Every structure is written in structure tokens, then in C-alpha cells.
């Protein structure tokens, strides 16, 4: 019987939309109202051809707030729909209200310049969309937000949202970790533009390059030139990797204001990656940390192979905790825990984090997951639930360790931001600009964008444009 009500409701709505020009725009098929979600409502498609790619992504991406255009709606009636979980229907038409239907409809006329507020429920969160018809008419003052409402994650199951921080800092490692093992040398100008685009997207930290021997990583031989070009950028910190004192001195001479050091929880991997044992590497890094302190340069620590090693296999959490504590004691303000070969799952990540958090505060820790086995987002989620609020990621999913076979594929920054948006977590990152940056570098490298979110959103925009 309920299905009969749905069919009757559909029929009534079709007639209303067909016979009443004030209820829909003539350029939009009636069927469109019954196939789209609450985030795919008709939004003045006549403006779409003149919009840039980035504007389209911002206007139609899942986290974007998109005010209606009064020209597209003909200065007429605005339809609002509230999804409910009940089987009753509330409507002005009494006969229509008798039928069982899982959503209700109401209409009202908006005066030009009147503020419109709509609640859109999507992916377990509610966003308040506000805008004025006068402002949206000119497209000059549109503002897009990926933030949830003041209730935060109140619409998400407590089992998921429990312990998740309200704000997560994203550390972008694409220009360094993402490009370091590319076989074809990327021009310095492309690297510089990529960094500029990433900073423009709102990312607070963008790891720019590495002052390592060109013999080991020829892709980053232009480290000084890159730093010379980006040192004047405002809005983000631009740390560089320095494997030893010589690299640190070169970085400081090039104007670096923050550096990073790289240790391993695996003895075998330490020997193959930085050509020394764990203890030898820690001794080397104490020298770097001391020099950095003298120059008032902050030092970030990395620990690789925190759950598994390509040579030794599983790594004990106690070994990870030991290395992390050593880096913390020598002065690292933040330590990033890297699953270098992407073998970790929540089942192995949680014990590792428990061991590390027993010796170092959670707010001093970051996570750095590779998506080799498709586990990165799941691992990030459990890390957030345990109190971690700093996540490393790479634009378009670029990169991996050149010394770890099969480790290609850092988790894509776009995918991380998309997931965090869905959780109601703030990042201050513009997803549209982020996707544009990923498309830029992917096009230059001649490969598809490795971000699933970016590919899906780009595909949806293309599909919407084809309907015009």
C-alpha cells in the first residue's frame, strides 16, 4: 500500500510541475526533480557554460554551499524539501496528505534580496546554505563552505564520531614525497606552480622539497631553485626534508624555515633507505636537532615502517614507540607515523598508536598512510577516533617510497578532505581548488588523477554540463 501512495504522489507532482509554470523552470525536465538528490537540485544551469572548471567544482561538489540563482528560477517560487524518516506526509493539499509518502513539500515566494536558508542532509551531516538572490544574480560574492553546522557531527552515529577532533590539520607532502620517485624529471616551474596552487587551496603545511643528495633522489636536485621561488609565499609553512647536517645547512642557506628528519622503526629498512642503523640515524639526527635549535628552526620527525617493513614484515609497536620517543626527546615538535608500504589495517594501526601514545602525547603525532591495499582512509578514521588530529596526504595520490617495492600511492589529499567534510570536520581547505591542483599535476605527468573523489566529482560536472 505504501508503494501505491508513492506512485500516486509521483503522479500528482508530475501534474503540478507540468501545469504550473511557477513551480519549475522550463529549461529543466520534470523528471529531473525525481532523479536527483537534495544536493543536485536545479541551480541555474544556463550559467554553467561560462563558468570555469574550478567554479563548477566548487558549485557542484558535495561540500560546496551553492546559492540559487534568481534568474535561473525566473524570480518565481522556490521549492523546499525536507527528507523525513516517517511514512506520513505533510502537505497543503489535504487529499495529498492522506497518502503515505516519505517526504514533505512546501513552497513559498521569496522577495528579491531575501535571505534563503535550506538544510541539506548529505553523508550523515547537515550544512546550512545561505545566500541572497541579489548576490547570486551577479555571481560576484558567492561564498562556499565545507563546514558543518554548529551541531558538528551530531547527525553521525556516536560510534563513528566519538573522539574525532573538530579540526584536522592536513600536511601536504605531494611536492616532495609525491614527486621524489618520478622517473621523468619534473620542471622546476611546474613544481613551483603546484606548490602555489596547494597553498592557494588553504592547506596550512606544504612540504616543498628535500635537500638530499641528487645521487639518491635526482628528481629533487633543484631543491634550492624551488625554495628560492616559493620562499615569499604567504599562508602556509613550507618544510623541507633534511637527512643530515649537510642537508640542514643547505636548507637553511636556501631560506628554509622548517625542516624534517626521517628515521625508521625497521633496522633493515633504515639500512636500505638511509644507509645506517636505527641508532646511527638517531645519533645523526640529534646533531641536526641541535643545529636547528641554535637557528630557531622547528624540526618535524618522520618514522617509517610503523606497522610493516618490505624486508622484515610486521614491525612490533614497541619498536615504533621507542623511535618516536627518541625523536620527541631530541626536540621534534611533531612526529609523523608512516605506513611506508601501505600494509596496515585498523587492526594493526590501533595497537601501534596505543603503544606510541603511551610515551608521546597524541597532539604531537601525525599519521601518514599509503593506500597500496586500499586501507588508508579506514586507518585515518580510526586514528582520528583515537585522538590524532594531524594527517599527511599527497595531492592526486602521488608518490610512495622509492626504496619500498610496491609502496606507490600515498592517500590522496582530495579523498581525505572529502571524507573529513562528510564527518563535519573542519580543515579550512577549498576542495575545488584542491581538485584543480591535482588535475594540473596529473595532466603534466600524463596520468589519471589518483583521487577517487576528484575523478567522481569531475565526472559529475561533465555529466551535468552534457544535459545543457
UniProtKB/Swiss-Prot annotation:
Predominant place of localization: mitochondrion
Catalytic activity: (3S)-3-hydroxy-3-methylglutaryl-CoA = acetoacetate + acetyl-CoA
GO terms assigned for molecular function: hydroxymethylglutaryl-CoA lyase activity; metal ion binding
Location(s), subcellular: Mitochondrion matrix
Binding-site positions, a divalent metal cation: 177, 368, 370, 410
InterPro entries: Aldolase_TIM, HMGL, PYR_CT
Gene3D superfamilies xref list: Aldolase class I (3.20.20.70)
Pfam families: HMGL-like (PF00682)
Residues binding substrate: 176
Boundaries of every Pyruvate carboxyltransferase domain copy: 168-435
Pathway note: Metabolic intermediate metabolism; (S)-3-hydroxy-3-methylglutaryl-CoA degradation; acetoacetate from (S)-3-hydroxy-3-methylglutaryl-CoA: step 1/1
SUPFAM superfamilies membership: Aldolase (SSF51569)
Cofactor: a divalent metal cation
Assigned keywords, A-Z: Lyase, Metal-binding, Mitochondrion
Residues forming the catalytic site: 401
Record has Cytoplasm as a keyword: no
Enzyme class label: lyase
Subunit annotation: Homodimer.
Similarity annotation: Belongs to the HMG-CoA lyase family.
Chain's role: Involved in the catabolism of branched amino acids such as leucine.
PANTHER family linked: HYDROXYMETHYLGLUTARYL-COA LYASE (PTHR42738:SF7)
Protein name per its UniProtKB record: Hydroxymethylglutaryl-CoA lyase, mitochondrial
Amino acid at each position: 500500500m505504501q508503494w501505491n501512495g508513492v506512485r500516486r504522489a509521483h503522479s500528482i507532482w508530475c501534474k503540478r510541475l507540468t501545469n504550473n509554470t511557477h513551480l519549475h523552470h522550463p529549461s529543466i525536465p520534470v523528471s529531473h526533480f525525481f532523479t536527483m538528490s537534495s544536493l543536485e537540485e536545479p541551480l541555474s544551469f544556463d550559467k554553467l557554460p561560462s563558468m570555469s572548471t574550478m567554479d563548477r567544482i566548487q558549485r557542484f561538489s558535495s561540500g560546496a554551499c551553492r546559492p540559487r540563482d534568481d534568474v535561473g528560477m525566473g524570480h518565481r517560487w522556490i521549492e523546499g524539501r525536507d527528507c523525513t524518516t516517517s511514512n506520513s506526509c505533510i502537505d497543503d493539499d489535504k487529499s495529498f496528505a492522506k497518502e503515505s509518502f516519505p517526504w514533505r513539500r512546501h513552497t513559498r515566494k521569496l522577495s528579491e534580496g531575501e535571505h534563503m536558508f535550506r538544510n541539506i542532509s548529505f553523508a550523515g551531516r547537515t550544512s546550512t546554505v545561505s545566500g541572497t538572490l541579489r548576490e547570486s544574480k551577479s555571481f560576484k560574492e558567492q561564498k562556499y563552505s565545507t563546514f558543518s553546522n554548529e551541531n558538528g557531527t551530531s547527525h553521525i552515529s556516536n560510534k563513528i564520531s566519538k573522539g574525532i577532533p573538530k579540526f584536522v590539520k592536513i600536511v601536504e607532502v605531494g611536492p616532495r614525497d609525491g614527486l621524489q620517485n618520478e622517473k621523468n624529471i619534473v620542471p622546476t616551474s611546474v613544481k613551483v606552480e603546484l606548490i602555489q596552487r596547494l597553498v592557494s587551496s588553504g592547506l596550512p603545511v606544504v612540504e616543498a622539497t628535500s635537500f638530499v643528495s641528487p645521487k639518491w633522489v635526482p628528481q629533487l636536485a633543484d631543491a634550492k631553485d624551488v625554495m628560492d621561488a616559493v620562499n615569499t609565499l604567504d599562508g602556509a609553512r613550507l618544510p623541507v626534508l633534511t637527512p643530515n647536517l649537510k642537508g640542514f645547512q643547505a636548507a637553511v642557506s636556501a631560506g628554509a624555515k622548517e625542516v624534517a628528519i626521517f628515521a625508521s622503526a625497521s633496522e633493515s629498512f633504515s639500512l636500505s633507505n638511509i644507509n645506517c642503523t636505527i641508532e646511527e640515524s638517531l645519533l645523526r639526527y640529534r646533531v641536526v636537532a641541535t643545529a636547528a635549535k641554535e637557528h630557531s628552526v622547528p624540526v618535524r620527525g618522520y618514522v617509517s615502517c610503523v606497522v610493516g617493513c618490505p624486508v622484515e614484515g610486521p614491525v612490533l609497536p614497541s619498536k615504533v614507540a621507542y623511535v618516536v620517543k627518541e625523536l620527541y626527546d631530541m626536540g621534534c615538535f611533531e612526529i609523523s607515523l608512516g605506513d611506508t608500504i601501505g600494509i596496515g589495517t585498523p587492526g594493526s594501526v590501533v595497537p601501534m598508536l596505543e603503544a606510541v601514545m603511551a610515551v608521546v602525547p597524541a597532539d604531537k603525532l601525525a599519521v601518514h598512510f599509503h593506500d597500496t591495499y586500499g586501507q588508508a582512509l579506514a586507518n585515518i578514521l580510526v586514528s582520528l577516533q583515537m585522538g590524532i588530529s594531524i594527517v599527511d596526504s599527497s595531492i592526486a595520490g602521488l608518490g610512495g617510497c622509492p626504496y619500498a617495492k610496491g609502496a606507490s600511492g600515498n592517500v590522496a589529499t582530495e579523498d581525505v578532505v572529502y571524507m573529513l567534510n562528510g564527518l563535519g570536520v573542519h580543515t579550512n581547505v577549498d576542495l575545488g581548488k584542491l581538485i584543480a591542483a591535482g588535475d594540473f599535476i596529473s595532466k603534466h605527468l600524463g596520468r589519471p588523477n589518483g583521487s577517487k573523489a576528484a575523478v567522481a566529482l569531475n565526472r559529475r560536472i561533465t555529466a551535468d554540463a552534457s544535459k545543457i
